[in-house]
């Protein structure tokens, strides 16, 4: 249980997909103009992560790993193709659900909802998971089972959600601020993201 909590907390604060690895920046910047859309996309990304990582974990350990299916056969070279296929299938499911139950959110997110399929935060989490499987059990980043994969996925998703909602809230306030003309738009947004990333650096020394 301690290891699950450690994975969860680390993936939110220490190994945050946005502020530590700058993954998923395209949709992060594009959809963070208001809090409502940011929450919707953040929840969608979290759901996709929680579903895809355990599936990709099983693929990695039961199919792709060396000697997993046949002795002497290593199918790890297929990981990119299979991981992307799983992610694309889950994103298609999420898109249909959002369109069915929240047409206004579906219209607001536009092209960025299906683009979750190529969101590098989703693929990055699967590749980090693949790497962490090989670590020793004493390593706090070790992923050694479905529960670990779910904990890491949920933490990564919540970390991404917090990052995009935080930026959206700030950008809503900045809309009424007297921002210098040369910095309006993406200029002040990049500065804000940089300051937020620096704030999250205070968690980098945590050993949990």
Where are the language model's segments positioned?
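Generic transmembrane alpha-helix signature in multi-pass membrane proteins
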Residues: 22-30, 95-101, 112-113, 120-139
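Ordered, amphipathic secondary-structure segments that act as subunit-interaction surfaces
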Residues: 61-109
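Interfacial loop-to-transmembrane junctions
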Residues: 172-190
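Cytoplasmic-side transmembrane-helix entry/capping segments in multi-pass membrane proteins
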Residues: 37-47, 78-83, 105-116, 182-188
């Amino acid at each position: 249980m301690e290891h699950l909590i450690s994975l969860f907390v680390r993936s939110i604060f220490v190994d945050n997909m946005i502020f530590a690895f700058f993954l998923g920046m395209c949709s992060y910047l594009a959809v963070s103009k208001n809090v409502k859309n940011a929450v919707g996309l953040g929840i969608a990304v979290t759901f996709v992560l929680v579903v895809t990582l355990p599936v990709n974990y099983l693929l990695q350990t039961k199919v792709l790993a060396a000697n997993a299916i046949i002795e002497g056969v290593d199918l790890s070279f297929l990981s990119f193709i299979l991981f992307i296929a799983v992610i694309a299938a889950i994103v298609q499911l999420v898109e249909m659900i959002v369109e069915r139950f929240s047409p206004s959110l579906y219209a607001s997110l536009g092209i960025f909802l299906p683009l979750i399929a190529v969101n590098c935060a989703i693929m990055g989490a699967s590749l980090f998971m693949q790497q962490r499987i090989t670590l020793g059990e004493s390593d706090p980043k070790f992923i050694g089972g479905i529960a670990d994969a779910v904990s890491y996925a949920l933490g990564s998703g919540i970390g991404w959600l917090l990052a995009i909602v935080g930026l959206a809230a700030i950008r809503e306030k900045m809309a009424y601020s007297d921002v210098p003309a040369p910095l309006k738009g993406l200029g002040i947004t990049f500065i804000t993201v940089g300051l937020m990333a620096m704030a999250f650096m205070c968690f980098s020394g945590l050993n949990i």
